[in-house]
């Protein structure tokens, strides 16, 4: 693999590597949240990093003052809410292969303030440890495309008590399967188009007969890569483009602890906005900023997603050609 090619994969995928891997007062069509918070993936979301050990930190900020009903109309509720999360991430991509793809694994150790469990602005929790996750992935690098498949396990390590407004976790186990691809339309791979689809399933919430509906999440974007020559074999690599997401319930919430009139509804939301990220080779650092205002929400909050991240290549495991 050329140094530029290795750097491009590193730059485009380090954000996946550091990510891979979240009592409704209004008695109207309440929807429970799943574990996957949209907005954590964007440009080149379907690309796995080159073999290596990666450490990262992600900050997610979500301000909102709007809740939409099933027709898309804003529900008149007072107040506003800002949910904030910080996630420490560890990712390893190995040279071991399965079905021709590199095997990788990730851990996420998240902290959150004001965790949203239902579509309510009545949330007041301190910055505290929330539900962690473990991930596994397989990645393939083709001539004009990358492919990645994965599995994420969400573990209910946060505090949870049914009906409380100070929960830091969701009280449920989550199983998520992902498949994504990054396609390069031009021969020089300056342009990239990416999308990753995730399907999430949940156990009943602890101590309840409430099962959050199966959830689908699509994240990706369209971007342009720019290179700047610096000292050393790998250039500085910048990526600028538009990132977006769609999240929707595939099945409605169910269980005997949910009133019959509130069962079966399916929420949705979309987000779209700019992303810029840069890989600086000498300190082996990647920096990212992403802003995605939401629209088209149904039965959930509609706000603004802001993501900042930093990733560090702790050790490269790329095999050098002889």
Question: Regions from the language model: what does each represent?
Answer:
Residues 45-52, 94-104, 141-148, 185-191, ...:
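Short loop/turn motifs that connect adjacent beta-strands in outer-membrane beta-barrel proteins
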Residues 68, 74, 208-322:
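Outer membrane beta-barrel transmembrane domains
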Residues 39-41, 53-55, 59, 84-90, ...:
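Hydrophobic, lipid-facing positions within transmembrane beta-strands of outer-membrane proteins
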């Amino acid at each position: 693999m050329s140094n530029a090619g290795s750097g491009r994969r590193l730059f485009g995928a380090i954000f996946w590597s550091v990510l891979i891997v979240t009592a409704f007062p209004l008695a109207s069509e309440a929807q429970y949240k799943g574990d996957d918070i949209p907005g954590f993936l964007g440009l080149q979301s379907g690309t796995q990093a080159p073999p290596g050990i990666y450490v990262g930190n992600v900050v997610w900020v979500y301000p909102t003052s709007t809740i939409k009903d099933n027709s898309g109309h804003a529900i008149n509720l007072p107040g506003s809410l800002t949910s904030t999360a910080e996630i420490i991430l560890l990712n390893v991509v190995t040279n071991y292969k399965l079905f021709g793809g590199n095997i990788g694994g990730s851990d996420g150790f998240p902290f959150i303030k004001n965790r949203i469990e239902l579509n309510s602005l009545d949330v007041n929790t301190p910055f505290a440890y929330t539900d962690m996750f473990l991930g596994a992935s397989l990645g393939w690098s083709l001539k004009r495309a990358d492919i990645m498949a994965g599995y994420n396990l969400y573990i209910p390590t946060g505090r949870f008590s049914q009906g409380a407004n100070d929960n830091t976790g969701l009280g449920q186990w989550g199983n998520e399967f992902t498949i994504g691809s990054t396609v390069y339309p031009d021969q020089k791979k300056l342009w990239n188009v990416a999308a990753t689809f995730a399907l999430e399933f949940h156990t009943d919430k602890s101590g309840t007969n409430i099962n959050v509906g199966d959830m689908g999440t699509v994240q990706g974007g369209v971007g342009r890569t720019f290179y700047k020559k610096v000292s050393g074999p790998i250039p500085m690599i910048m990526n600028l483009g538009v990132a977006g997401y769609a999240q929707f319930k595939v099945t409605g919430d169910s269980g005997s602890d949910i009133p019959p009139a509130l069962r079966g509804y399916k929420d949705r939301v979309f987000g779209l906005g700019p992303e810029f990220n840069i890989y600086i080779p000498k300190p082996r650092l990647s920096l990212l900023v992403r802003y995605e205002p939401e629209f088209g929400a149904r039965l959930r909050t509609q706000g603004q997603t802001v993501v900042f991240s930093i990733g560090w290549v702790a050790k490269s495991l790329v095999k050098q050609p002889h």
